[in-house]
Each structure stands twice: as structure tokens, then as C-alpha cells.
Amino acid sequence: MHTDTTRENPQASAPQAADSSQDLAATAPGQLRVIKRNGTVVPYTDDKITVAITKAFLAVEGGTAAASSRIHDTVRRLTEQVTATFKRRMPSGGTIHIEEIQDQVELALMRAGEQKVARDYVIYREARAAERKNAGAASDVAQPHPSIRITRADGSLSPLDMGRLNTIISEACEGLAEVDGALIERETLKNLYDGVAEKDVNTALVMTARTLVEREPNYSYVTARLLMDTLRAEALGFLGVAESAPHHEMAELYAKALPAYIEKGAEFELVDAKLKEFDLEKLGKAIDHERDQQFTYLGLQTLYDRYFIHKDGIRFELPQIFFMRVAMGLAIEEKDREARAIEFYNLLSSFDYMSSPPTLFNAGTLRPQLSSCYLTTVPDDLSGIYGAIHDNAMLSKFAGGLGNDWTPVRALGSYIKGTNGKSQGVVPFLKVVNDTAVAVNQGGKRKGAVCAYLETWHLDIEEFLELRKNTGDDRRRTHDMNTANWIPDLFMKRVFDDGSWTLFSPSDVPDLHDLYGKAFEERYEYYEALASYGKLKLHKVVQAKDLWRKMLSMLFETGHPWLTFKDPCNLRSPQQHVGVVHSSNLCTEITLNTNKDEIAVCNLGSINLVNHIVDGKLDTAKLEKTVKTAVRMLDNVIDINYYSVPQAQNSNFKHRPVGLGIMGFQDALYLQHIPYGSDAAIAFADQSMEAISYYAIQASCDLADERGAYQTFQGSLWSQGILPIDSEKKLIEERGAKYIEVDLSETLDWAPLRERVQKGIRNSNIMAIAPTATIANITGVSQSIEPTYQNLYVKSNLSGEFTVINPYLVRDLKARGLWDPVMVNDLKYYDGSVQQIERIPQDLKDLYATAFEVETRWIVEAASRRQKWIDQAQSLNLYIAGASGKKLDVTYRMAWFRGLKTTYYLRALAATSTEKSTINTGKLNAVSAGGNDGLQAAPAAEPKPAPVPQACSIDNPDCEACQ
């Protein structure tokens, strides 16, 4: 809010500004401050929280508890938790009302299982509140409320303009049902004090509104609009367009702001000067300012913190200008670039489709690194190994996610001819890769993220499985990077048939790396025979089931290595004629060929399924239009992209792969009133992906007509009229019907497309379903193909903490007269689950089952139906409640048996770990910290399952490499 201070607060005259050292500390920038009940502001200190918690324990356990080290440790830990909560919420400092601190103390006590102490603390607070109320009649209430003056940037004091404050709140609430502007105003004034900085008034508005989200999801839109007011004042003022602006003036101001933004951006070398060559007047008129209103708070705050272009900390890129900048960057090589820019802008700004974060970060800038994923193969020589690590650093520097194939590197104990010595194996090099990934900062946005792949026959595989363990020699551990097992079908057959399995060094069996299917089986058995005859000394024979059991055990305990399947990735690859898929990528959805001359690159984007459900059905006409434009945008990325290593450019120009995916699958089910765990959900997964596949292949054929087929088209499966659904049959034939069961049904007429694709297609690969962690937040929909994690939780990420509540659940509960404060508290008590809330009907319990309440078989089956239509793969997380070795065994066998190419994270809870957090006993704005980031499993016994990971980058809560 840009505050016009011409009107005084009518409530009272202003007191003199204080000048004590405490007051100076309380108003220092970047500090946490506490507003006391009498309106004075003091510095935030841990000591008073420690005293309050200690008194609460002493009241329950008696005075002798003061000497207990247990009490001291507990109090210290709880104090740290409370302080950490506020620092996460307000990393740049801010003001906290004393009541909010007490709310957090109460919550911390209950989460720690100290129910007796918490109950006593609640009773104490209520008693003190009653005392204040009685005393207030004679003192506090009798005194006039002091007026509030704000401190401007130049240090001058001016009265707070209550009229302006009211106008901004009213505008933020306009058109939204069941939100209370007067409540926001009252609560905001509680968090203001005399002499408050102008920017802190804006912050107080946002912080106040966001605490109300748990009561009513529409407050998320209110909060976003209040933040938008701050952003507009910041950006428009910097651009010299206006000091501030109400929403209804933005249509005119956006048209003025766009050319001013392009001019400033080019001047500061933050955007490409070529953007000045566009018809900016035409583009400015095409901007739809009403689309500013569709952001949730999480979405806009994410963009504000990490995406909008800024100079010296000042954001001067408004949301619609941000989308137009990306659109212009993607249209820069188009013939009719204005028309294409408007087409691309409309797709992005409507949230019908969203490009991946690297594209959003960098399109239209001087360094347009727009690609999400890179895959490399590491050769078996020292210069090649360190060359690959160098490539990792260069690719990661500009926000790419990496998948490295380490299978060619010889195993521990292998002979090295050049030195007449023995190899130390793969693991020491992976330690270097790990440390490089941590060291490389991706444009200041996130640390590097990498996944190392190793085939299951590699002699180092057993040590590879243990890389993420917290015990053992730390020199042979990689705590900060991901690992994945690249599993041939023959190994899975041996597991099913209870056979043995032989481990080799790739230096002795070099051709296995490039073989798959029956050819691999024949050659592998040949090498097994050589080993049995004593002609291959360096090998090891194990029972396949024992190795499988260890793979699952490590996956459960450490979260790694992920299980991915070599043969379906290769047998169904359209590009078998020019190479081999040796690994997947960081997020396990990309399956492209790699070799010493080619680093595979893939550009990602995702269709928002929610926006394509109209009147409870999939709008295929709109979907076709969206897919056509999306594929064009993805294809454009290939030519515009900045390539930091030549092998990446070589690969991308030859094959032109792209990865079109989806997000909002769970929300699309809600709109159709379909439970995730149902045959109807599987049918929707099948039919929606079939339609997207059809339209995407068709769109790529259209581009081939216009621009030509990709260079290596001849000889591909496409050139033979073999579509993804057809390659599924090849997998069945090679693997054997005994080991696979997939649905091959079709609902569309594919014959014309089979014929057409033989004439040419623009892209070697077209579809891949990425995790969409960040862009789903931006658009306000459920992530990718994920089931809902919790119906109410606090999401913590680099932008702070955000209460997330399922708006569809709230809608349905309201319709049945069940939405009230008690229901909010019940949802908190049961960690966002509805299953144990008795008054919720069974049909809603089925519809709003959360991830661990949906049987894993439904997730696998839906993924299997999608996979038959996709030429690449899916980032598929598997959720297992009551996890056991048997459940993991059944789940991952089923994933392979159903023809899946890859799996991603295992999110496992042991039998007793669905532990409730706490109930809101009063007015706490504090709910279970969860979501797809942050759940810590609490199993009954060792071994413990790995914590549910925050994201694919181990030390970063919002991986932006793959969305």
C-alpha cells in the first residue's frame, strides 16, 4: 500500500515519538518487534518466551522442576521452535502482536506432547484475559486510542490515512464471498504502532489477511491483492508511471508501464534490447489487467520473491508484464512476432499453460537459458570424468537439473592399464559431484541439483545403494545429491523367478551399457557363463531377491536410490535408431539418448487441467488449442536457448525433444467429484492423457509442415508410423507377456495420425510429466499428477510460510452446512485428514482422501494408463502408509509389471506414524507444517523411513530445475 497521509486518524491525537534506546532497537530495520497490548513496541527477545514456558512447566510440575535439566532442555528447544517460526515468516523482520507469540507457545507445547502444560497455559491465558477485561473498564478502555503516525522514507512523520487504508482493503475484498474487510482493518491496526515505517503498514496488511486463510480460502486472494498493491507502488513508482494505482486504473497504466519497463530493463542489461523492436503499444493494449486478480497469495508471493526482475532490490516487473516479457522472449524469432507474443501471453497469463521455471526466469533476458533438464553419460577415463563434472557445473550454473549416467566408469578393484594400478570405483568421483552440486549457485536462485544413475549389474551397486546413509565412512557418502538405480528387465525377471544375479565391472563387459531387451539378456548370460568358467575374475554372484531387498531397504531408510527401468525407456523410445537411453534426469520424467558427443536437453511446460474442465467435463476443443500453442512455445525454446556446453546444443538441434506435461490432476478430479482412488479416476487419467497425446503429436506434425522435420527423423519410430501406444506392444513382445500387464484400449481414431506422422514430425520427443512444484504454486492448482497431501497445512518454502486449505473441500462442506470454526480445528487436529471427523459424510471422505489414504495401487494404475500415451516418462511419487518390506515389494513389482518407465520419491509412513499435531484451542493461526514439503515421518520402530523430501534438490525446498 502506498499510503497517502493527508487524512488523520480521527480516533485521537498523536503522542510524541519516543527516543529511548529500547525504542530505537524496536524500530531498527530487519529486526523482529513485539507489539504489547498497550500499543508500545519493544524488541523481540527469546528470554521472555523462555520465562513464560518455564513458568508453565513449574505451575504443573512444582518448584523443584526448576533444577531439572530435562525441563531446561525442553524449554530451550521450544523457545527455539517459536523463534524459528517467526523468522521463517518474516525473514526481513517485522512486528508481532503479543497474542500471536502466546498462540505459538501454546502450539509448541501441544506439538511437543506437553498437553498438561499446554492446558494449564491456556487456562492461565484465559484468566489473565478476564482480568484485563475487568481492569479495562477502569483504565485501558477509558483512555483514547492513540492515533498512528507513519514514518516516511525521508524520516518525516505523517498521520496514517485511515480512508486510504479502508479503500485498499475494500478493493482487495471486492467480488469475493465471505471475506470481512472490517475484520482485516481491526486486526491490522493491532499490529501498527506510532512511528511505524510506511512499508511496514503494507506488510501488516498482508500478514493480517494471510492469517485468515484457514477460515475462508478467499482470504488467499485478498492477501494476494494486498501484496499486489505494494508491488504496484514499488514498480510503477520506479518506472515513473504513477506513485500508486487502484486496480481499475491498471488497464491504462499497464499500457504505459510496458514500454517504460522494457526501456529500463534494457538500460540495466536485465532484458534483451531486442524487445524494444516489438510494437509495444500493440502489446500494451493486449495486456489484461483483470488477470492480476486470479493469483493466490502463495502464487504471487512466489513470483515476487524469486521471479520478477529487480534492480537494487526494487521489483519493477508487474505480473502481466512478467508474462508478456516471457511471451516476447519466446516469440522473438517468429515472423509475426507481435501476434505470437499475444498468443503466448494469453496462454500464460490465463494459467491455461505454464512454462517451466528456467523459461520463466530467463526468457527475454540477455542469457536465455530456458531448458529444465540435462542428461549426460560419463566416460571411463579421468579427463572424461572431470570433463563431465565441469559440464555439470556449467549447466547447473544457469538453473538446469542434471541426470548423470555413471555406469561406464569401472568398478572398485578394476585394472587401470595407464598406471598399472587398481580403480577406486565410482563412489569417490560421486563425492566430488555431490560437492560440486552444493557449491554451484544457480544464478543466485537455487543450488545445483543432480541425480547419479547406475545400472544394477555394476559391481559398485551395493555401495552405491548406501550413498545416502548417515552412518559409515563419510568420504564415501553423498548427502546432498540424488541417486537412482537403472534396472534392466532381466534383473526384475530374476527377482520374480528367484534367480541369481551377477555383478560386473563395465571395463570387462563394456557392451552391456548399450544393450537392452533380448539383446541384453543374451549378452549378459554370455558374460555370466564366462564368469562361471573363470574367464572373468572380477565379478560377484548374489541372489536377485537379496539385492532387491537391499534396494527397497535403502529406499525406505534413505529415500534413495530411486527405481527406474532401463528396458521400457529404450524399447519404447522413438529414437532407438540413433542411440540409447542411459539414464533419466533429475526428476525421472525425461528419457533421452546420451553419448560422449551429445548431452540430452529437454524443455518443459505443463497444461493446467483445471482450466480445461468445463461443466464437469474435459473441454477437448479448448485443450486442442492450448496444446497447439504450448508445443509451438516449447519448440521455439530450442532455437532461442542459451547453451553453456556445445554437446547440449548439438543434441538439441538434431533431435528437438520437448516435454509437455500436466498439472492440477487432483483438482480436475475434484471438479468432477471423482475420488482419486476409483475406476473413474483411472479412466480420466487414461482419456485426458490420450487427448493430450493426440493433440501434441498433431501439433508437432503441424510444425513439421511449417518448419520441417527434425534432423534424425528418418528411421525413428515416428517415421514408421509407430506411436507411443504402439510401442507398448513392442515392450510386451520383448519382455514376455508373463511379466507385464497393461491396458491397450483407445477411444480416439489414431489411424489418420499414424499415417500423417510418417511424413514428418518436428520433435523427436513431445511429452513428459514433470513434478511442477513451483508452477503449480504460481497457478494455484495441485501439483502435477499428485494426490492431495493434506487438506489443511502450512507450506514452508523460500518465500515464507503459507496456510494452504483445500478450497474444494471448503466449498462442499459449506454446501452441507458443515463449515464452521469447529471444523477448522478438527482439520488441524487430524492433520488435514477428514477420515476421523464423524460428521463428514462418507462420500466426502472418499473424495477428499489424502495421499497416504489413497491405496498405492490406484496411483500406479493411473500412471500406467497415462504411460501408454507418453513417449517419455512421469515423475511418479509413491505414497505408502503403514509401510513394510512386503508393501514396498508389492508396490514396486507392480510398477514394473504395469509397464512404468520410472518412479520418483517413495513417501513412506511406518505403521504408527500418522501422528496428530495439535488442535487450535482458541484463535491460533497455526496448523500442521506439511504439504509436499516438510513432513517428518514418525515411525514406531527402527529402521526409520526417510523423511518425506522437500524437493528434488536435497537442500532446497523448491526445486526449480524441473518445475
What are these regions (language model features)?
Residues 77-82, 104-110, 196, 211, ...:
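Core structural elements
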Residues 268-302, 590-593, 634-639, 743-747, ...:
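Catalytic alpha/beta core of large soluble enzyme barrels
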Residues 2-24, 130, 134-138, 913-963:
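Acidic, low-complexity intrinsically disordered tails
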Residues 419, 423-431, 438-548, 553, ...:
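Conserved catalytic alpha/beta cores of large enzymes that bind or transform nucleotide phosphates
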Residues 309, 322-341, 345-369, 375-418, ...:
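Function-dense linear segments that define catalytic or interfacial modules
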Residues 626-649, 653, 675-772, 842-845, ...:
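Internal maturation/activation junctions in enzymes
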Residues 2-33, 40, 67-149, 153-157, ...:
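Core nucleic-acid recognition elements
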